[in-house]
Structures are given as C-alpha cells and as structure tokens.
C-alpha cells in the first residue's frame, strides 16, 4: 500500500500544476477583419475607388490592323451606319491547311490502293457471273461488260500512278459510281423477290380465306342441325306436359264432383244419425219402467217399422246417384228424409204425453216392469245393429260414387 502524502505535499500540488500549465503555449486565433485606420469613412472610400481605377487601367500596345478597323466601325456607327467588316484569313493559315491535307492523303494512299484492288477482284467475279446470266438470257449486255472492264483497266492505271489529291478524288468518285450501279442492280433483284413474295402471300391469304369460309359454313350447318334436334326434343317434352295438364284437369273435375256428392250425402247421413239418437231417447223411458205395456208395445213397434222403412229409403237414396249420377234426385231424397224425421218426432211427442198421464198405474204393475226391461234391451240391440248397417252404407256409398262419375 502506498503511503499517504503529507499535508504539505497536498497543498503544494496545485502550485506545481499551475506551473506546468503556464509553460504550455497558448493558441492564438488571428482576427479575420483588419483593424480600421484612424481616418474617416468618406476619405477612405474615395481612396479605394482611385486605387481600383489605377489597377484596372493597364496600358496595352496596339500593333494589329484589326484595332484600326474596329475604330473605323465605331466612327461609322456614330454617324448612323453600322458596318461589320470581317477580317481576311491570313495566307499562311491556308497554306498550312493544304499541307496537312496532302500529308493525310499520302498516308491513306496505301490503304486505299489495297481496298481498291480487293474491290476490283470482287467486281470481276460479279461481272463474270452477270455475263453468264446475260448470255443465257440472250447475250444482250455484252457491251456493258466490256465497258466495265475498260473502266477497271483505267482505274488500275490511275491507282498505279502516285498522283495528287485530284487523281485520288476522281478514283473515289468512280468507285462510288460503280457501287451505286451495283446497289441499283441488287435493289432491282430485291424488288423482284419482294414482288414474288407478295404474290405468294396473296395466294396464301386467298387460300386461308377460303378455308375459313368453309369452316364457318360447316359450323353454321352443325349449329342448324343442333337447333332442329333441340326443337324436336322440346316438342316431345311439351306433349307429355300437355297430356299431364289435361289429366290434372280431369282429376280436378272428378275431385270436385266427389266433394259435391259428399256434401249431398251428408244430410242423408245426418238424418240417419238423428234417427238413431231418437231411437235411443225412446229406449230410455222404457228402461225406467214408466210406460204401460200397450205404450211399450206401440213404441217398440214404431221404431222397428221406422227402421224398416228407413232402410229401403236409404238404399234407394244411395242407388239413385250411382245409377243416374244426378244431384237433383239426391236433394229430393234428402228432403223426403227430413219429412219422415218430422213425422217421427211428432209420434214421440204424443207418446210422451201419454207417459205423463199413466205414471200412477206403473207403480202398481210390478210384473210389467220386467217386460219393460226386456223390451229396452231389445231396443238397444236393434239400435246398435242399425248403427253398424248405416256405417256399411256410408262406406259403400263413398266407394260407388267415383265409379258412377267416371
């Protein structure tokens, strides 16, 4: 562990540091703006303008004739006539340009000669081919071939002689003319080929148009056949639908007739039920034993007779609509049944009056009650038999009615 410094040493450290810092050089930042002089602003501005004028005015020696012409132009402009005179090109510059052109032509001369020789060989081959073609066609252009050969000989002679720029220009112009002729010939051939191609294209187009028309016709025929078949199928489907509709109408008519017949049959059946109810009512006082033997015998005979009479009437009612199929007869039969029921009710009322008068005699006659009980049992059995017969008649009537309508 380092020993702690004494208090005197601690107090001396800041002094040492300050001494070291004082030894370091202080960075100096120079001012950008110069300090003002002691003179005033007005005097200073005048001096600066004079100094600028002195610096801009520099004496230039005037030795060229162009300056003199410019001065003349300025004088003319002052008089109202502005004339611009172009300075003539010095002769030395024109001579230098000619020398440079000659040097360039001499350098390119060798290359041009080689290119001309190669072109001459190609031209000879083309000329030979053309001559063969012309001989086959009729030997019409022999003179042109000879002229071309003469022109080539002259060109070769000119190329062999090292001439000036004029001779080279002449050769270039001739080469261009020959190339133009060759290009014209090639253009003619290309035009002929293009015409043939156009003819072929037209023929191909006409052929394709015919094929397209034929395909369209075939497609239309197929569509027509398909439509006819569809119409036939639709017609066949429409017939069974119409037949089905007619059958439905017939069935509806039959159902309506059955409903009417059922309605007409209801009053008859209601009348029959009323008969059974009345018969049951008649049987109740007999069970109580409140009637005389004579009354019992008379009442028992009446419902039996009524039942016997009612049965043939019911049979006639049901048979008449089956045989004739007329609604009027059914109605009349229903009316007759109502009248019969009215007559039966009157008989029962009279019997009730007689019952009230003979209540006292019933008590004395005990033996007669046994007979009354037996008669009441017989009436119950007869009423049940009549109900079963009526149900059978109802079922038979419902089954036979549709047959009579058909």
Curated annotation (Swiss-Prot):
Q: Which UniProt keywords apply?
A: Chromatin regulator, DNA-binding, Isopeptide bond, Nucleus, Phosphoprotein, Transcription, Transcription regulation, Ubl conjugation
Q: An example Gene Ontology cellular component term from the record? A: nucleus
Sequence ranges of Basic and acidic residues compositional bias: 63-72, 92-101, 110-126, 136-159, 166-187, 201-239, 246-266, 272-284, 290-311, 326-365, 377-406
Q: Which GO terms describe its molecular function?
A: chromatin binding; nucleosomal DNA binding
Q: Which residues carry this modification: Phosphothreonine?
A: 29
Query: Cross-link Glycyl lysine isopeptide (Lys-Gly) (interchain with G-Cter in SUMO1): which residues?
Result: 98
Query: Spans of biased composition, class Acidic residues?
Result: 188-200, 312-325, 366-376
Known tissue expression? Expressed in liver, spleen, lung, heart, kidney, muscle and brain (at protein level). Widely expressed with highest levels in submaxillary gland, thymus, kidney and liver and lowest levels in brain, lung, pancreas and eye.
| Pfam families to which the protein is assigned, alphabetical | HMG14_17
> Annotated cross-link Glycyl lysine isopeptide (Lys-Gly) (interchain with G-Cter in SUMO2) - which positions?
64, 98, 121
Q: Which PROSITE patterns has this protein been placed in? A: HMG14_17 (PS00355)
Annotated Basic residues bias? 35-44
Q: Name one GO biological process term.
A: regulation of transcription by RNA polymerase II
Q: Known InterPro entries for this protein? A: HMGN5, HMGN_fam
* Region of interest (Disordered), ranges: 1-406
The entry's free-text remark on domains says:
Specifically targeted by its C-terminus to nucleosomes in euchromatin.
Family membership: Belongs to the HMGN family.
Q: What is this protein called?
A: High mobility group nucleosome-binding domain-containing protein 5
Give the source species: Mus musculus
């Amino acid at each position: 562990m380092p020993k702690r410094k004494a208090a005197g040493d601690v107090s001396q450290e800041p002094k040492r540091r300050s001494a070291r810092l004082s030894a370091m050089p202080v960075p100096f930042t120079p001012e950008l703006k110069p300090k003002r002089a002691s003179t005033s602003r007005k005097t200073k501005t005048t001096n600066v303008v004079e100094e600028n004028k002195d610096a801009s005015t520099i004496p230039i020696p005037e030795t060229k004739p162009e300056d003199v012409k410019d001065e003349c132009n300025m004088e003319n402009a002052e008089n109202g006539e502005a004339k611009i005179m172009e300075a003539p090109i010095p002769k030395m510059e024109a001579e230098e340009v000619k020398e440079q052109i000659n040097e360039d032509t001499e350098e390119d001369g060798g290359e041009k000669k080689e290119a001309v020789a190669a072109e001459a060989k190609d031209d000879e081959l083309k000329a030979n081919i053309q001559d063969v073609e012309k001989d086959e066609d009729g030997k019409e252009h022999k003179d042109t071939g000879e002229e071309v050969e003469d022109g080539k000989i002259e060109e070769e002679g000119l190329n062999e002689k090292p001439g000036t720029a004029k001779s080279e220009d002449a050769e270039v112009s001739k080469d261009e003319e020959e190339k133009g002729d060759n290009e014209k010939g090639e253009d003619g051939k290309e035009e002929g080929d293009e015409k043939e191609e156009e003819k072929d294209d037209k023929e191909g187009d006409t052929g394709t148009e015919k094929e397209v028309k034929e395909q369209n016709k075939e497609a239309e025929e197929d569509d027509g056949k398909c439509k006819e078949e569809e119409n036939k199928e639709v017609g066949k489907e429409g017939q069974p639908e119409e037949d089905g509709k007619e059958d439905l109408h017939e069935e509806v008519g039959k159902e309506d007739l059955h409903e009417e017949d059922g309605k007409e049959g209801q009053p008859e059946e209601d009348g029959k039920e009323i008969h059974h109810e009345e018969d049951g009512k008649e049987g109740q006082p007999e069970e109580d034993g409140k009637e005389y033997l004579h009354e019992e015998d008379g009442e028992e005979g009446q419902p039996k007779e009524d039942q016997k009479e009612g049965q043939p009437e019911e049979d006639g009612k049901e048979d008449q609509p089956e045989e004739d199929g007329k609604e009027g007869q059914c109605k009349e039969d229903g009316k007759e049944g109502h009248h019969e029921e009215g007559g039966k009710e009157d008989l029962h009322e009279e019997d009730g009056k007689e019952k009230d008068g003979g209540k006292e005699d019933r008590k004395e006659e005990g033996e007669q009650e046994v007979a009354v009980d037996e008669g009441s049992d017989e009436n119950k059995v007869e009423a049940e038999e009549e109900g079963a017969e009526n149900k059978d008649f109802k079922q038979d009537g419902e089954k036979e009615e549709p047959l009579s309508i058909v």
